[in-house]
């Protein structure tokens, strides 16, 4: 129980930190891409 708890704690902050950084970068890039992709998607 001690092992999984330690692993989970290390994984939780690591995952959130990585996701936050990835989401922020992806969101920024996607937002700009959405401007040009939105009309294409609407057309499609």
UniProtKB/Swiss-Prot annotation:
The terms describing its cellular component in GO are:
endospore-forming forespore
InterPro entries, from UniProt?
SASP_SspN (IPR012612)
User: Its GO biological process terms?
Assistant: asexual sporulation; sporulation resulting in formation of a cellular spore
Region described as Disordered: spans on this chain = 1-44
> What Pfam family is a match for this entry?
SspN
The subcellular localization recorded is: Spore core
Q: Which UniProt keywords apply?
A: Sporulation
Q: Which domain of life is it from?
A: Bacteria
Location, primary (coarse class): other
- What upregulates this protein? Expressed only in the forespore compartment of sporulating cells.
Query: In which family does this protein belong, per the annotation?
Result: Belongs to the SspN family.
What protein name does the entry list? Small, acid-soluble spore protein N
Q: Which organism is it from?
A: Bacillus cereus (strain ATCC 14579 / DSM 31 / CCUG 7414 / JCM 2152 / NBRC 15305 / NCIMB 9373 / NCTC 2599 / NRRL B-3711)
Q: Which gene encodes it?
A: sspN
């Amino acid at each position: 129980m001690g092992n999984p708890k330690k692993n989970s704690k290390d994984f939780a902050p690591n995952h959130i930190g990585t996701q936050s950084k990835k989401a922020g970068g992806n969101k920024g890039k996607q937002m700009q891409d959405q401007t040009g992709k939105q009309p294409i998607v609407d057309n499609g």
